[in-house]
Curated annotation (Swiss-Prot):
MF terms in GO: manganese ion binding; metalloaminopeptidase activity
Active site positions: K267, R341
Listed name of the protein: Probable cytosol aminopeptidase
NCBIfam families membership: PRK00913.1-2 (NF002073)
Amino acids binding Mn(2+) 2: K255, D260, D278, E339
Coiled coil: none
Disulphide linkage map: none
Organism lineage string: Bacteria, Bacillati, Bacillota, Clostridia, Eubacteriales
Cofactor: Mn(2+)
Gene field: pepA
Sites where the protein binds Mn(2+) 1: D260, D337, E339
Its EC number(s): 3.4.11.1, 3.4.11.10
Length: 491
């Protein structure tokens, strides 16, 4: 989709729909209102209140180059955030598309305390997020109206922001498409192919290890999970050398579980169909690496994705087994449905052994996260307070909300084992998200590491005025912003 920034006046831009973002109590721009013979003033404050997400479509009747004007509510000016502006832009773009628009233009909001670059960035992100259609595999393809061009009305700072927003949105949408793809269409091998294709297109070095390669690396935990599958695992390593490859390296690690049946500890039928999205962390890593490369972030970033599915079979690993992986730590299997932390542990150990200075990992790790936080925020669990705060702030700046969970030493008692170094579950239902995150910390040594548990926010149930049902791409923006800030710290 084409995204352009133009310095044209509101009364000069020739598009199908001109979108005017307005806060509560703010009048429409005087020049547009005058051109429409006072129509905007009649509507604003009457039918249109400016409430968050409210839209009112006006026909210009040839009095403006734009065929229609869409009034878009932002809510109270003091409550507008990067996230709410992004959401409003998505709502506006979808409303314009529903009206048949093929080209749209956004004015920048005037009553909001946000600089031009940031406003253009989050409007662009929101528009491209809202307009994105997830792929389908239907035998009959029905034609659907599509917006082909998005214009932002602003100057050079807006141009910079819109370009940033476009690149990030494309990374998020790539992550959404990957996590939405059915497991039979996206096995570990096919996920590796998609990652390698992205790397080739963006100048990123990539290595893909097959089952034999995983054995040679000593990825015993990944291989244990893979035992019940007919699909071989893959271990994907991507290296973006934005700082010339001299280091220091930031490590991004994503869980690539392409389908999770639960293994022998099999999941209930209800909801199992959706376990194709259990590689949402890996999808976020791939989308982020694309964006990091296209933004030309001046940092060296290593991304690691351990990938397999988790299936029951006569050869599957079993509850009670003791296995070990790259870190050398031994794990007593309490549940084969707690497999994500196993494959991530090998990925994290690899990143740490490769010398990454700091690591962020993301996964749909625990159902307990939904109980703790609901579908609003992801959880952060870490082994280093300072690094956790940096990642938390990066997420906030990128418009992704997290919440820091405790990591007191006593919580490690939850994963103690009498026969191994640790268990892969908990002895009861207490603090499941904390226990899962701290399990991961056991495999990175002293390397500062933050885990994002995105289980409750990686999937949206039901479409609304902003986005379609399906994968959300959460984590992608946090990864990108954290990498950008990591680069700034090197200067």
């Amino acid at each position: 989709m084409k995204v352009e920034v133009t310095s044209q006046a509101l009364t000069e831009v020739a598009v199908d729909v001109l979108i005017l973002p307005l806060t509560e109590g703010t009048p429409a721009p005087a020049d547009v209102n005058e051109a429409l013979g006072g129509l905007c003033a009649q509507v604003v404050g009457a039918d249109f209140k400016g409430e968050m997400g409210q839209t009112t479509l006006l026909y210009t009747g040839g009095r403006l180059p734009a065929r229609k004007v869409l009034l878009l509510g932002l809510g109270k000016a003091e409550k507008v955030t990067n996230r709410s502006l992004r959401r409003a832009a998505g709502i506006g773009a979808r409303a314009a598309r529903k009206s048949g628009a093929r080209s749209i233009a956004f004015a920048l909001p005037g009553a909001v305390e946000m600089d031009e670059a940031a406003a253009a960035r989050f409007i662009t992100e929101g528009a491209l997020h809202g307009l994105f259609r997830l792929p389908d595999w239907k035998s009959e393809k029905k034609p659907r109206p599509e917006v082909e061009a998005v214009h932002i009305l602003g100057g050079e700072r807006a141009r910079e922001g819109a370009e940033h927003g476009r690149i990030v949105a494309e990374g998020v949408n790539l992550a959404r498409a990957l996590a939405w793809t059915p497991g039979n269409h996206l096995t570990a091998a096919k996920l590796a192919e998609r990652a390698a294709e992205m790397c080739r297109e963006n100048g990123i070095e990539v290595e893909v290890y097959d089952k034999k390669g995983c054995e040679e690396l000593g990825l015993g935990l990944l291989l244990a999970v893979n035992q019940g599958s007919r699909e071989e695992p893959r271990f994907i390593v991507m290296r973006y050398k934005g700082n010339g490859g001299q280091g220091p390296w930031l490590g991004l690690v994503g869980k690539g579980l392409t389908f999770d049946s639960g293994g022998i500890s099999i999941k209930p039928t209800e909801g199992m169909w959706n376990m194709k999205m259990d590689m949402g962390g890996a999808a976020a890593v791939i989308g982020a690496m694309q964006a990091i490369a296209r933004l030309k972030v001046k940092a060296d970033v290593m991304a690691v994705i351990p990938s397999t599915d988790n299936m029951p079979d006569g050869g599957s690993y079993k509850p009670g087994d003791v296995v070990s992986g790259l870190s050398g730590k031994t794990v007593e299997i309490r549940s084969t449905d707690a497999e994500g932390r196993l494959i991530l542990a090998d990925g994290l150990a690899y990143a740490a052994k490769q010398g990454c200075r700091k690591i962020i990992t993301a996964s749909t790790l625990t159902g307990a996260c939904n109980i703790a936080l609901g579908p609003i925020r992801y959880a952060l669990v870490a082994n280093d307070d300072a690094w956790e705060e940096e990642v938390y702030r990066a997420g906030e700046a990128a418009g992704e909300r997290g919440w820091k969970l405790p990591h007191d030493e006593e919580y490690y008692d939850l994963i103690k084992s009498s026969v191994a170094d640790m268990i892969n579950g908990t002895k009861n239902r207490a603090a499941g998200t904390v226990a899962g995150g701290l399990f991961l910390m056991k495999h990175v040594g002293d390397t500062p590491c933050v885990h994002l548990d995105i289980a409750a926010v990686a999937w949206k149930s039901g479409s609304d005025e902003y986005e379609d049902e399906g994968a959300t791409g959460v984590g992608t923006r946090t990864f990108v912003e954290a990498a950008r800030r990591f680069a700034e710290g090197l200067r």
